[in-house]
Amino acid sequence: SRRKATLGVLLGCVFTVSFMITLLVVSLKTVADDLNSTTGVISWAITAPMLAFGVVGPAFGKVGDLWGHKRVFVGGLFIAGVFAICTALAWDAPSMIIFRTLSAAGGSALGPAAMAYINRMFDPSERVRPLGYWSFVTAGAPVIGVVAGVPLVSIFGWRTIFLMQAPLCLIGCIVAWWLLGDTERRKNVKFDVQGALSLGIGSVLILLAINRGPAWGFISARTLSVALLGVVVLIYFVRVEKRASDPMLPLQWFRTRNVAFPVASQALTNFAYMGGFMIVPQLLEIGLGFSTSHIGWLIIARPLVFSLVAPFSGRIAMRFGERNAGVIGAIAVMFSMLLLSQVDAGASDLYIAFGLSLSGMGLGIASPALTALLANSVDVADLGVASAVQQLLNQMGAVLGAAVMVGVHEATISSGIVKSFSYALLAGAISSAIGIFAASAVRRTPRVL
């Protein structure tokens, strides 16, 4: 059917802007050596796009809601493809980081637009299943990228990553323009420029302070100044939105139970999920002396299980309800952190893989259900910006989790290397436990139209 074909195109295009993320992470040293730089500098090719991906999304989501998501989707994909070519041709570290960031900024348009299409195509009672497929793609793409891409990178070099991505993006533009239908355009509504700029600037300052906290020091003057400036800008954003006739982000959403609590639960579980992504490989390498290849095949268990569980999350949600699916998922992530916090020299590969798999299973169950609850609680005309705000807050939770859990490890390293990693993972367990309570606070409500 056309609906299935459209879903396939949306997910295929999302895959093209997602598959290289983990592959680039494992190739940082190769990139640094080729560009006569250091991994510390080249790591900004991960950090800067991550900031751009979360921050630019709300503006793209709002533009799509106002002027049509087809143009935003195809335009974002085109930008991602053009700057992927530029990244492949980068001549030094700054050019590579800039081009990669611009490519990610274009790719950030796809998430809100694709979610808006999915939520328009499927009735509220049907949304969990296609959102499960969405989670399958977003979790599975990095796995496929690593498995298929590492051999190519080792033979042909890191530029292969982007030489593969660019034609996929441009082909996706053609297919999407041909197949996707136009969404409705809202007349006599202005784009909230002040709101978009203040939300974007405030968010990037907060994310930057969180991300650089471990390097600068969480209580250093630089970190506190950046964070304080971010808070001031976000306060200004709230004042702008209260006065705006057509606000960028309806503030009343955060007083709606099925908007505030699903977003909070996802951010809290992403805190643990992303923090674990940073901590566990270090635990295995530095604490236990595992080889890089050994670690790679162990940590792949988490996104693999995520991608396998997500397509079935619809059945789980329909059987037990979205709230229970969110609670079950957060519980699984919490137990994952608790199990991994007990890893020591005597832990078996099976035990470690099981602990990692629980994290993947938890997010695979919870994310589609909580995303569907959010979509069912906002007006159809605001689905793009709602999805983008969810993307932004999830990103904030992930960045905060990575920074805080690394900070806990560094602050407690005097107690022993392995023990300090254990304390960091316990911080993730606490965050997930709070996420359980947030998920339990949601309820099924009629969709607000």
Protein language model annotation of sequence segments:
Residues 3-20, 24-28, 39-49, 78, ...:
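12-transmembrane solute porter fold
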Residues 55-94:
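Conserved MFS/SLC helix-loop-helix module at the cytosolic interface between two early adjacent transmembrane helices
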Residues 1-4, 125, 173-200, 242-257, ...:
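Flexible interhelical linker loops that connect adjacent transmembrane helices
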Residues 101-136:
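Cytoplasmic helix-loop-helix junction between adjacent transmembrane helices
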Residues 30, 58-62, 66, 151, ...:
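Membrane-interface helix termini in secondary transporters
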